């Protein structure tokens, strides 16, 4: 264990047995990530929770009484924040969450384990909603192949799928938030969002690792068909 340039203790993991270097580096990063440590102290399920907190604190997506859809919800950090901020824990708002993986119960959240790629997934989600949503948010990530262009197209395709669903279920004035990655492959997606929302912007929360190309596309003021402003 050594100190880094900020004076914090830095944990180093030895490579032993069958542990791969990539696994060692991932584990080291987790152990030395201040957001991971903070999430444990605050009782949040993942460091990603702070990304939504920062975005919502700035743009005020989540309000009491709202209905929210959380796509790719596991392990539940975003659902936790959404449930608290819309009042779902007290039965005032509603949070519908899905993921391909299992997710432990979150107070105020209705969760179903399903593959969003499945043909019947949108229909099942609409039935769970029982009406329109105020916010559709997605922290889904596509499986990577290691081939940069292929991975970019997969990620954009996943966001396009989420955006299409949002266009089917959002109330007028609703918002769409989705994880994406910086690339030149999302021009068509942005053009569609500009037609459907009043404002479209990219945001990179402080909790997003600075060495990552991860960012979020935030579309607000759902209206469909009218030109929007890209910020």
UniProtKB/Swiss-Prot annotation:
Principal cellular location given in the protein's record: cytoplasm
GO molecular function: rRNA (uridine-2'-O-)-methyltransferase activity
Pfam families given in the database record: FtsJ (PF01728)
Binding site for S-adenosyl-L-methionine: 76, 78, 99, 115, 139
InterPro entries associated with the record: RNA_methyltr_RlmE, RNA_MeTrfase_FtsJ_dom, rRNA-MeTfrase_E, SAM-dependent_MTases_sf
GO CC annotation: cytoplasm
Catalytic activity: uridine(2552) in 23S rRNA + S-adenosyl-L-methionine = 2'-O-methyluridine(2552) in 23S rRNA + S-adenosyl-L-homocysteine + H(+)
Protein localization: Cytoplasm
Its EC number(s): 2.1.1.166
Annotated active site: 179
Gene3D superfamilies with a match to the protein in the record: Vaccinia Virus protein VP39
Keywords: Cytoplasm, Methyltransferase, rRNA processing, S-adenosyl-L-methionine, Transferase
Family listed: Belongs to the class I-like SAM-binding methyltransferase superfamily. RNA methyltransferase RlmE family.
General function of this protein: Specifically methylates the uridine in position 2552 of 23S rRNA at the 2'-O position of the ribose in the fully assembled 50S ribosomal subunit.
Alphabetical list of HAMAP family matching this protein: RNA_methyltr_E
Name of this protein: Ribosomal RNA large subunit methyltransferase E
């Amino acid at each position: 264990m050594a100190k880094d340039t900020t004076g914090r203790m830095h944990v180093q993991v030895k490579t032993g047995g069958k542990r791969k270097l990539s696994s060692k580096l991932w584990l080291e990063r987790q152990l030395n990530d201040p957001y991971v440590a903070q999430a444990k102290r605050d009782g949040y399920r993942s460091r990603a929770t702070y990304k939504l907190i920062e975005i919502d604190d700035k743009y005020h997506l989540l309000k009491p009484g709202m209905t929210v859809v959380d796509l790719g919800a596991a392990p539940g950090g975003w659902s936790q924040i959404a449930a608290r901020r819309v009042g779902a824990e007290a039965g005032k708002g509603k949070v519908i969450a899905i993921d391909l993986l299992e997710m432990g119960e979150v107070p105020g959240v209705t969760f179903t384990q399903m593959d969003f790629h499945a043909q019947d997934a949108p229909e099942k989600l609409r039935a769970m909603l029982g009406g329109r949503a105020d916010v559709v948010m997605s922290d889904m990530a596509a499986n990577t192949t290691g081939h940069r262009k292929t991975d970019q197209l997969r990620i954009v395709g996943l966001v396009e799928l989420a955006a299409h669903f949002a266009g089917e279920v959002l109330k007028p004035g609703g918002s769409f938030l989705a994880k994406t990655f910086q690339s030149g492959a999302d021009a068509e997606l942005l053009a569609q969002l500009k037609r459907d929302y009043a404002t479209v912007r990219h945001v990179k929360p402080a909790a997003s690792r600075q060495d990552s190309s991860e960012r979020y596309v935030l579309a607000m003021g759902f209206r469909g068909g009218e030109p929007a402003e890209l910020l």
